[in-house]
């Protein structure tokens, strides 16, 4: 019987030893996670910038290849079915002002023209930004707009109200340089990269001129906020974790591309200006964080990486090629309602003065007018009035006393 039912082997570890071993494993995993994931040293900014630039460039090249392949497919369909090519029937010829004619009449040679420095443009932009910063110092509109944007409907439930604690618009100004004009097609692709420009290539519908300029900004533009992480499980407000975050833009350099799209009266579309940044830009942040109320964790590297990655993705999805921002331009033709200056300016000043001062200004003006009239009345008897209405034509005897006749009278005339 002992040979049929073998005896069970005794476990080498007791229950207590297994429990302790399991707890140690969990502690080691948590320690490794905290050390390498949360407090691990982030990669250098140069490495991160290189990786992001490579990803953006690969995305741009993939978009360009898809556009070129789509063009080849459409061209093949037009060759196989000429009836689809209605462009030549509806539009017998290119517009009068083509890209080639504009470049020739403005004496701009794409291949040989030297890039411009844009010093005058930098001065105008600096004045505009300085005025914007000055207005922000005396107005809370920008703070109100930021608070509404941060506490909008997209705020998750586990976040408390977000408060803006610091806002710095910087002290320096962006520098634009190396501006050049490049003809592009309707998809924003250059004509014949590496070849001499031919005006006949730019006669396609949608072709336009594109201004590209380098932008460089080294400043400290800071936005600091604070909020609380709310743990609503298993019951509401089970735990609260204060969080403070400050994000600063310290460096931006890239290539800005600006294009002008004419209006289309047939579709009732206004003229537009589009701008985008090429994929070779660099955007550096300085991110500071603070977690907790008593035992605080300061400048957690992983939080900085997550926030920076989210900001880069937000910027890429909005104004980095192939995406762009579009601005509708108003009608540039002079209109009466847009006229300023002259009599309207005087009337506007008078209305503003009446609103600001009201009865006090009118009273002072009447008092000054009364004093002037009284002074003229007292001194009127002692001086001869010079007004034209007090003058009279002099008689002959007053102008030439002692003469009986007008000088120069003919002999034999009546005295």
UniProtKB/Swiss-Prot annotation:
This is Maintenance of mitochondrial morphology protein 1. It holds the Pfam family MMM1. GO terms for cellular component: endoplasmic reticulum; endoplasmic reticulum membrane; ERMES complex. Keywords: Endoplasmic reticulum, Lipid transport, Lipid-binding, Membrane, Transmembrane, Transmembrane helix, Transport. The keyword Endoplasmic reticulum applies. Belongs to the MMM1 family. The chain crosses the membrane at residues 19-39. GO terms for molecular function: lipid binding; lipid transfer activity. It is found in: Endoplasmic reticulum membrane. Residues 1-18 are lumenal. It comes from Neurospora crassa (strain ATCC 24698 / 74-OR23-1A / CBS 708.71 / DSM 1257 / FGSC 987). CDD domains: SMP_Mmm1. It comes from the Eukaryota.
